[in-house]
């Protein structure tokens, strides 16, 4: 057994330590790249467990990498040296406090953007920046570590622009609070309480410490919503339109798809429609033999989308 794995196995519950070969292979890669193999995946459930893990790794000189929902495609949580320990934060996903009077919410770093949004929706509030397209799985800690953009970015900027405070376990295993939360008996309502230490731990991919909690501001949910889409033959006019709309603060989100991505999305939509049609036709046939014959006939005819349609730039 690896020396650091032996050490942490004596300090932490066995159920949060994973050395299964398949899990090691999975967690040693992100959506795009494969990194050096890690030696263990640890899924802490409390701040104390995170601190114990960090101290054990410090004693052994073992690198630590931190992972949220695993949606990174930029090597954000990949190890840079073999036999590192990966900390999977998704077990720490509690919504700690919602303060409607002072307009903030405190969450554990492993909470997904979708979970937070759905929890706040009945209260009529949301965070100004409220996650990525992958927010069903992507975590708040991961979004802050990679300084993600998407929902709300049209008016409120990036994830890092919308943080009041973070609670961080440092490289020595100490717990550090930033912003007004660093003061005893003070609420985490203000980021700029002295030097902006909060900013140190945003966009760092977890390199400067393990974020265990974050406090985000709250704003009212809009009373009405509207959506529109535009097609462009070239990227230049689309980008200029996006820039002008952003300058006028006319939308909370604006994003575009290039021809390649748009074509992939159209293929997926076409395949989904074909599958639905296949299911409907087959269900109408009587007898298993007829079902097989009709299904094979449709399958052999190929998908309705063959890439012949000209695809341009699309702005939503």
What residues fall within each predicted segment?
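FAD-binding subdomain of flavoenzyme oxidoreductases
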Residues: 94-98, 108-109, 113-250
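Short, flexible turn/loop "capping" segments at secondary-structure junctions
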Residues: 32-35, 97-98, 220-223, 307-310
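N-terminal flexible segment immediately upstream of the FAD-binding catalytic core
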Residues: 1-55, 71-103, 262-269
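Short, hydrophobic beta-strand segments
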Residues: 34-40, 228, 310-316
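C-terminal substrate-recognition/cap domain of FAD-linked oxidoreductases
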Residues: 239-316
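Short, glycine/charge-rich beta-strand/loop segments that flank catalytic centers
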Residues: 67-76, 131-140, 258-261
